Structure formats: structure tokens, C-alpha cells
Amino acid sequence: MKFTCDRSALVDKLGVLARGVSTRSALPVLSGILLQANEGRLDLFATDMELSIKANLTTPVERDGEIVVPARLFSDVVRNLPDEEVVVEAGEAAVKVSAGRAAFSLNSWAAADFPQTSTFDMTGSFKVGREPFIATLNKAGRAASRDETRPILTGVLMTIMGDTLKMVATDSYRLAVKETKLDHSLETEVQAIVPVKALGEVTRLASALGPGDIEVSIGENQAVFKLSDPAGDVWIASRLIEGQFPNYKQLLPDTFDHEVTIDRGQLMATARRVSLLAQKNAPLRMAFAENRLTMKALTQDVGQAEEAIDVEFSGEPFEIGFNPGYLIEGVDAIDDAATVLRFTSPLRPGLISGPGDDFTYLIMPIRLSS
């Protein structure tokens, strides 16, 4: 294998592939990137056995072939080469990398040792605008669990029905539901539980590439996302999470006893200030009384904080407590100037939303001691 390519273009693609390289696998070849040069095109692959990434470059190929290079070292070498065309040539057990007067020889692996976990098949694909996809995940994905002991909760339930994209995530302490209208309508309903990590990589790359579409294919056990770019296309493939996603509709109350509308900026600023004293798992307390919300935090051996906000509230006073981080993340997801808070009782979940109904954030309360 031997090919020549632009250094900057190769650096960019290696940066994309790095997100799929395994850093803690017992299989050394997974710390590498597979290079396949064939008929004027270079394909690059990386996988950690759950997430796989493919990228390509159009570049002169002198000799077809394939080799697996150590991802981090190869990337560092290419990044630090002179700003000239890079020549990569594979031998039996090493790959030569050169540009200008600089030359390197790196140990490599045979391509046959690299596991191909995805064919990046786009059968039955459909397109979703990058901007609505990013906006939907940014709101819903924040509620997904990062705890691998319950794999189903590390996924996002993604549904596309008609012209609506819906994403749902929960870590059992909070629940986020976001619906977004699409420019195109799908004839059949598509639903899958996709790891939040994979969706995060898709949105990160989509944000970097700018406006356009994401082509999506949902197979029996994997999802593939393709992002087209003049500099070379990128595919991200992820396994789907098996199992039954929690029946989130049962968790959403039909009615609430209290509804309060608060200026989002004021609520965020107050919550952030007061929560500075909500340490060591201490709750952020919200005490509602006639036309007033008082936010409090108390941590033994640290101190306490309190701040009041004028609100339109009437009825029996009550106090409810929340994890401060979860509360702030919910309010932060609201785009409108006003935030709507709904409650039933101090021991029932609270609901955060904007004036519209396309985003819902349910948060479990913390039982308060007197």
C-alpha cells in the first residue's frame, strides 16, 4: 500500500477517527486505525467494538493495500510533519510516513487482525436535518444515565413518526422528553434505543460540519449515521441497546396542583448561587408561599444560603427539595424567557417546561428532613 495525501486533510480525518479508538481494550489492535487505500480513495476505520467510525478521503493511490497503524502515534506524527504532502507506505510489519525531509517508520498490525464490527450499511435510510437533530439530543440526552450497570438507561429512545422526531432519556432520577418537527415526513415509524455516547458523537461531528442533513439507517441490531462533507464523508455506527425502555408515559402526571411561571434567567442565577451551599448531597430547597419562592441550601459544617424570588403563587405553602444539579440542567434546557414549574406535592415529581409543550423535564424530589 502506498498513497499520498494532504497533511491537513489527513489530520482532520484522524481527529474524527480518534473518537472511536479503544483506549482500554485487551485487544491491542483496537488501539489502531485501519487504513484501506484503493483506486484513488483512502478509507479509515476505528472501533471500540460498540462504536465504529468510518471516514474517507479522495487521494492519489500508487499501490492498493491495507494496514492498521497505532492511532495516537500515527496521528501525532502526521500532525507534526512539515506542511507538505504526506506519503504513507506499508511494509510487512511497519508503515513508513514521510513529508519533506522528515521520515518515520512505525510498527503496525495486519489488516486481517482488525475486527470489522459494522458494514456501514445504509439500507432503508432516511434524512434528518442536522440542526433539529442536535437540538433534540442536547435537551433529551442530558437525562440519560452514564452508569453502565443499567445499560437500558444509558440509551436514548429515538422515535421518528411522520414529521416528528422524539427523543426520550431517563436515569431514573429525571426524565427528559423532546419533540421536534422535521422538514420531511416519514411514511413508516422508526424506533430504536441508541447509546447516548454514540448520539453525542453524531451531534458533535454534525455541529463541526455545519448545516446539512444526517442520513440515518436503523437495522436489526445497529444504527448507522452518515454525514456528507465535501472533504470526505463520515459514518458512525453503533450497536442498539436491547431490552424494554421504561414506560415513560406512565411517569408523567396528567394533572398538577400548582403551576408557577418564573423568569428563566432569574431562576437559573438564584439556583446557581444558592446551590453553592448545597454540598455533600444536600438538596436545594424550594419553599413556596404567597407570591414568593424562597430557595435554600444547608450543608452541615459548611454553611447555608437563602434567596427569595417574587412569583405568582397562591394556595397552601409547601416546600420541595431537588438535586441542585438536576434542577439547574432542567432549567438550562429551556429556550424561552419563561420557565414553567408544575408540582403536586413535596413527595411527587416536579415538571419543568417552557410555555410550549415540545420539551418536558420531570425530576424526582428529595425527601426533606425538618
Segments (PLM) and residue ranges:
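Structural preference for solvent-exposed beta-strand-turn elements
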Residues: M1-S370
